[in-house]
Regions:
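Conserved N-terminal segment of class I S-adenosyl-L-methionine
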Residues: 1-66, 81-84, 99, 116-117, ...
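Short "lid" loop at the C-terminus of a central beta-strand within the Rossmann-like core
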Residues: 53, 101-106, 122
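A short SAM/SAH-binding and catalytic strip from SAM-dependent methyltransferases
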Residues: 66-79
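Helix-to-beta-strand junctions that scaffold the AdoMet/dcAdoMet cofactor pocket
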Residues: 76-77, 90-92
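Conserved beta-strand signature within the Rossmann-like core of class I S-adenosyl-L-methionine
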Residues: 93-102
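Short glycine/proline- and charge-enriched loop/turn segments
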Residues: 109-117
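Short secondary-structure junctions
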Residues: 137-141
Length: 152
């Protein structure tokens, strides 16, 4: 229940943007695709992809109305390559929901809990988010709780 509450930080704002029957992908869903289940419970079609737990690459030949990426982007060894993959399978006008801890100057990087996880190999600031949006020609909305919604 607490995990679903955590995931609702991305689920709730993106679901407001979706049309009935929208098709989604949980990109980097991990071993238990709880977010995909939350969307399915609300009658959205959901596919899942995770390079370790659900490595079926057939999603890369599909097109999606929305894509979620929750606590995943900090694990990208080649972030631009991953974001380009996402862009290729997101329909024009589609939504990409990103949740990751966003670094800012109020955080002492050396003490930051997020950087202490050895699997976190890249970090994002709001400047990074703006640059990513510009590079990909996406618009964006920064939401609370480390959530950003991009629209293609």
């Amino acid at each position: 229940e607490r995990y679903r509450e955590f995931l609702s930080r991305l689920h709730d704002p993106i679901i407001e943007k979706l049309k009935k029957g929208a098709k989604g992908l949980d990109y980097g869903c991990g071993p238990g695709p709880a977010l995909a289940l939350m969307f399915k419970e609300e009658n959205f079609s959901m596919d899942i992809y995770d390079p370790f737990f659900f490595p079926d690459k057939s999603c890369f030949s599909e097109q999606y109305d929305f894509i979620t990426c929750t606590e995943v982007a900090e694990h990208f060894f080649q972030p631009l390559k991953e974001f380009k993959k996402i862009d290729q399978i997101l329909v024009k006008g589609g939504w990409f929901g990103l949740m990751t801890s966003i670094y800012d100057d109020s955080i002492c990087f050396e003490d930051w809990y997020y950087r202490k996880d050895p699997t976190h190999v890249v970090f994002y600031s709001f400047e990074t988010i703006k640059a990513l949006a510009a590079l990909m020609s996406w618009s964006y909305e920064r939401r609370e709780n480390n959530v950003v919604l991009f629209q293609k």
